[in-house]
């Protein structure tokens, strides 16, 4: 495919937007899904004052801006800001003219119908794209792992889902959503560090905590055992240097933080952990396909990046499943971007080319065409 009509792949997450060209093995642009507006108009005089900033630029000017995330728990809640993020994606990050390309977008499982229509409408009417398609994030992650049947545990910044998929199609009745993800774990780690005497309060300091989380946290295979080890020795302690040069020591917080994925009660939530949610999702599926799901549990998203998460998942799921069941957890190293990678693979398949919704079809049928062509 010539560069000029290469499809664009845009994966809009609650925390990060991943964008690039179909056929590439990783996204060209990865930036925070946020829009910032000046708190006071007047301060900004002479700064070539824009009325809004997107992504990294908003992040770096956060001191004088009010920041908003237009995607909450995986679902778009503010369309004006979402449009700004897409505009930024095409024109500033990828530097392409959207009207020259087909665009593959991703959506959360159980995304409301009206939302899919709105996405479709904005793509065709605001950006005049040649063609577009909306794919379910978890399905793309499964494709990226080279499978068409399996259950995906997708956990990002804003939301986690367990999505059983059979022969390439998600089974909506068995999809479960868990409002517990990366942002909650960052908040929880902040609380744990405060107990240790390190206070992180501003939004800028939360970014530091996120970095500590990503660099030092891991999932314990046996939580009680690990707590005992941490109490009696300093072998689990690690140090972290803050931007101002201060060095802090982190101990049992390293595994207490992601433990909340398995024990949401730590956060005061009354929901099931990721192992029970995965099990419950499988149990909502037909008896005949459960074996295939148990042996193809695919982890996806940034909040599945903790070392030790796959072994723990295997242990906890084995405890819930029938005794003879073969369980296999697949944790691809690139799983942080596997939704985007799956989109890149799908959009470059020759068999996919007839699946696009074209401008002509949109003009004939309107936004509801998306329900007929994307499922």
UniProtKB/Swiss-Prot annotation:
Catalytic activity: ATP + H2O = ADP + phosphate + H(+)
SMART domains given in the database record: ACTIN
One Pfam family of this chain: Actin
EC number annotated for this UniProt entry: 3.6.4.-
Keywords: ATP-binding, Cytoplasm, Cytoskeleton, Hydrolase, Nucleotide-binding
Highest taxon, organism lineage: Eukaryota
GO MF assignments: ATP binding; hydrolase activity
Subcellular location, record wording: Cytoplasm, Cytoskeleton
CDD domains, per the entry: ASKHA_NBD_actin
One Gene Ontology term, aspect cellular component: cytoskeleton
Main subcellular location of this protein, as a coarse class: cytoplasm
Role summary: Actins are highly conserved proteins that are involved in various types of cell motility and are ubiquitously expressed in all eukaryotic cells.
Family, similarity comment: Belongs to the actin family.
Protein's name according to its UniProt entry: Actin-1
Biological source species: Echinococcus granulosus (Hydatid tapeworm)
Phylogenetic classification of the source organism: Eukaryota, Metazoa, Spiralia, Lophotrochozoa, Platyhelminthes
Gene that this sequence comes from: ACTI
